[in-house]
From Swiss-Prot:
Residues 41-44, 165-169, 253-258, 286-293 are annotated as: Interaction with substrate tRNA. One of its GO terms (biological process) is tRNA modification. The record marks T107, R129 as: Interaction with substrate tRNA. This is tRNA dimethylallyltransferase. Monomer. Pfam families: IPPT. SUPFAM superfamilies: P-loop containing nucleoside triphosphate hydrolases. The gene is miaA.
Length: 323
């Protein structure tokens, strides 16, 4: 039997939680291959937010071209869908230049959008929702649950008869599409599985994960202290002085920024700022690791191993070289 031809990945994805050493590994790869780095970090897109986001320095960015860093103002928003569009265009452009796209970051929703796509379910329809609400006011949610059971018994069976929000959404989807929500979700799950299979071939996904989470937690504390010493409060104060930003914006909700903002508002003291900032970073890290563990196509490297960069490089070399 003839072996299947070797196909190099379209791009390499270097994933990992906060403080796992992604930047150092990416720059080491840039010294071995002609890479261009595509940032996959929802905080690095913002201009004037350098310290609290641990943005690569100018010297680090000079080692290899970097993309999707400093592309929007903190007043603006940037979505996972926009990232997927931008990243796909960059991948094609970088490959056309004969270089290797290296996607680096820990914003796993962005990774999902790039490799699996986002939900195609219809959005909310105000008119249909108002119609359903009127029926519920007249007949009660148990009556609407009974209606749902007639058209989508699978969904109705897992919902309580007074679960207004979910009953409303299931009926809304049925009235919008003529199909039960259970069937729509099953189709989406099948599509996601297909996309995961495709992603395994199209992308080499390497995950930097800690064998000992306590060591990563110590790194997080050291890193946050370094940010405070490096001028995080001055950076946030400069953002406050603009006068058009507030803690409700996605940019200011970034870990570290919302805590520093609260401190400058006089809501918390310095000890609480540090405690909350470190705790929020650890929670972010936990969520990132949970996402990673639901990514079966990833190749895991212990980010605490002394030779973790060499392990990453070995995986990349094996994927790029024709057997």
């Amino acid at each position: 039997m003839t072996a299947a031809p070797h196909t190099a990945p379209r791009a390499v994805c270097l994933l990992g939680p906060t403080a796992s050493g992604k930047t150092a590994a990416a720059l080491a790869l840039a010294e071995r291959w002609p890479v261009e780095i595509i940032s996959m970090d929802s905080a690095l897109v913002y201009r004037d937010m350098d310290i609290g986001t641990a943005k690569p320095s100018r010297a680090e960015q000079a080692i290899a071209p970097h993309h999707l860093i400093d592309i929007i103002d903190p007043l603006d928003a940037y979505s996972a869908a926009q990232f997927a569009t931008d990243a796909q265009a960059l991948i094609e452009a970088i490959r056309a230049r004969g270089r290797l796209p290296l996607i680096v970051g820990g914003t796993m929703l962005y990774y999902k959008a790039l490799t699996q796509g986002l939900s195609d379910l219809p959005g909310a329809d105000p008119a249909i929702r108002a119609e359903i609400d009127a029926e519920a006011a007249r007949d009660g949610w148990p009556a609407l649950h009974a209606k749902l059971a007639q058209v989508d018994p699978v969904t109705a069976a897992r919902l309580h008869a007074t679960d207004a929000q979910r009953i409303q959404r299931a009926l809304e989807l049925y009235r919008l599409t003529g199909q039960p929500m259970s069937a729509l979700l099953a189709r989406e799950a099948g599509a996601a599985a297909f996309h995961r299979h495709e992603a395994a071939a199209a992308y080499l996904s390497i995950a930097l994960e800690p064998a000992d989470r306590a060591v990563l937690h110590a790194r997080i504390a050291q890193r946050f202290d370094a940010m405070l010493a490096g001028g995080l409060l001055d950076e946030v104060e400069a953002l406050r002085r603009r006068g058009d930003l507030s803690p409700v914006l996605p940019s200011i909700r970034c870990v570290g920024y919302r805590q520093a903002w609260a401190y400058l508002d006089g809501e918390i003291d310095m000890a609480t700022l540090r405690e909350q900032g470190i705790a929020a970073t650890r929670q972010l890290c936990k969520r990132q690791i949970t996402w990673l563990r639901s990514t079966p196509e990833r190749r895991v490297v212990d980010c605490l191993a002394p030779d973790y960069v060499d392990q990453v490089a070995r995986l990349v070399r094996n994927a790029l070289e024709t057997p």
